[in-house]
């Protein structure tokens, strides 16, 4: 019982400090002080800071990913011989995350939003294995579902576009999205669920957009000339 309490205190302290300072900016000394434990406890329960980060992500990601897979399974079962609509696949991916947040207190939602933003700002080599471990299989299932729903597109195109989906989702629920940075055009006062619905419509259209035989749309000569001029100016 005491061991479980120590473990939970370390996880809670890690969430708070990682959200405030980032993973690389948080020391073991700060973690042990915030959790009121000794250094040996970190190594005993997690093996070190990397193991602690892994447990922090696992605690939040596992229930959400299980719900995502359940929803996708139900979609595919209901579709029978057909394929679920792109919008429904996106909903199955997005909504479990939203429901996870809705079950939390506002302070925890803010904490988890900042934590997610902090983790994604870590060096890629520091988080690639972590993301692959906790989200790789789930994302693969959704990419495969989208590939079947978008059979007219090459698989590599769908792969790339799903990465755009992930990036857009991350930005839409980061603190920076709500900054009023466009004079005269304030941020829409919509609920998280409404924002998700807007996102789904927007992203489904992007996923369905046609591509050339090379996997990209043809760009007008004017745009090519302009982009070339921009690159030349940037090199000066």
Could you say what each language-model-derived stretch is?
Residues 3, 7, 11-15:
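Short, leucine-enriched amphipathic alpha-helices that occur as contiguous helical runs
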Residues 88, 107-114, 121-150:
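Amphipathic alpha-helical packing segments from all-alpha helical-bundle domains
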Residues 96-99, 103, 133-236:
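C-terminal peripheral helix-coil segments that are non-catalytic and often amphipathic
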Residues 63-67, 71, 119, 123-126, ...:
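A short secondary-structure junction motif
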Residues 70-109, 162:
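Hydrophobic alpha-helical connector segments
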Residues 9, 17, 21-51, 55-63:
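Helix-turn-helix
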């Amino acid at each position: 019982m005491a061991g479980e309490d120590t473990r939970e205190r370390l996880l809670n302290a890690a969430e708070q400090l990682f959200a405030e300072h980032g993973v690389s900016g948080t020391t073991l000394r700060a973690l042990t002080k915030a959790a009121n434990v000794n250094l040996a406890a970190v190594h005993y329960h997690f093996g070190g800071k990397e193991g602690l980060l892994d447990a922090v992500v696992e605690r939040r990601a596992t229930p959400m990913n299980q719900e995502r897979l359940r929803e996708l399974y139900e979609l595919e079962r209901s579709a029978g011989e057909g394929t679920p609509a792109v919008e429904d696949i996106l909903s199955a991916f997005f909504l479990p995350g939203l429901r996870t947040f809705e079950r939390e207190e506002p302070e925890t939602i803010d904490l988890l939003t900042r934590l997610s933003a902090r983790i994604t700002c870590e060096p890629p080599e520091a988080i690639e294995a972590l993301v692959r471990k906790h989200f790789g299989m789930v994302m693969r299932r959704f990419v495969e579902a989208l590939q079947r729903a978008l059979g007219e597109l090459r698989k590599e195109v769908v792969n790339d576009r799903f990465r755009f989906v992930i990036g857009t989702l991350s930005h839409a629920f980061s603190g920076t999205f709500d900054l009023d940075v466009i004079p005269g055009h304030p941020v829409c006062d919509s609920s998280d669920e409404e924002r998700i619905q807007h996102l789904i419509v927007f992203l489904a259209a992007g996923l369905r957009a046609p591509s050339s035989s090379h996997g990209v749309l043809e760009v007008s000569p004017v745009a090519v000339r302009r982009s070339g001029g921009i690159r030349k100016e940037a090199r000066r």
